Structures are given as C-alpha cells and as structure tokens.
C-alpha cells in the first residue's frame, strides 16, 4: 500500500496528514516532510495519523525522531490517532503502547482540538 502525505496550516500549526501504511518503505517520506517543515521555520506541528492503517517499528522510529527534532527547536509535536484510537486502541496506539513510547507524545482527538492553545492532550 502507498502512503499519502498532505500538508496544511491551521491556527499557526503546520498540519501533516498521513494516510496508508507507515512502514520501512514509507517512513522516509514522512521524515522528509517533517524535516522540510522544521527547515522552513514551522516548529509547531500536528501529525495527523487518523488515516494510518498500519505502523511498524520504522514508523515509530520516524515519530520519535520527529519529536526529538521538533523539541530541539523548542517546538511542539501533537499527534492525532485514528478515530477513538487513544480510547479503544487503534493499531498505531497499540504499537506505541507496546513499545512503551505512547507516553512521549501529546495525543489529541482531532486536528481542530490539537491546533488550539488551551486544549489538554488525551491521557496516555
């Protein structure tokens, strides 16, 4: 399966929407988009994974690397998991939890909520 990555802006946040499978083959595409956003000075990023059906360790690696890069620029990274993912356990959420890295990320239910300054993330 291919990966589709779209970029937008909302409320001062760069929004990267990812759809498809985030794996060894497709993770470099996401890494490149995140690096390009940071290089362009966009240090507050919402990574919308609501359309991701599968994520392997390469996908998790790119999420962790993105977090590290953005934090090094004093930016913020917010994730959107598939519908009800943080509550009921989407594939992406289960992988992040199984690897013990879910707690590293601020997860929100949707892009609109993530792009608001006064919103709190969903619990880990």
Regions found by a protein language model. Give the residues of each.
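Helical "lid/switch" subdomain of P-loop NTPase nucleotide-binding domains
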Residues: 58-59
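STAS-like cytosolic regulatory interaction modules
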Residues: 1-53, 65-124
């Amino acid at each position: 399966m291919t990966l589709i990555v779209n970029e937008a802006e909302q409320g001062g946040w760069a929004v990267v929407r990812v759809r498809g499978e985030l794996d060894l083959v497709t993770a470099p595409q996401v890494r490149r988009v995140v690096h390009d956003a940071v290089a362009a000075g966009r240090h507050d990023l919402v990574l919308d994974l609501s359309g991701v059906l599968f994520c392997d360790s390469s996908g998790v690696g790119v999420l962790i690397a993105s977090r590290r890069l953005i934090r090094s620029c004093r930016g913020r990274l917010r994730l959107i998991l598939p519908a009800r993912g943080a509550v009921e356990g989407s594939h992406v959420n289960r992988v992040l939890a199984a690897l013990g890295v879910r707690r590293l990320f601020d997860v929100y239910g949707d892009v609109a909520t993530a792009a608001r300054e006064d919103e709190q993330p969903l619990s880990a």
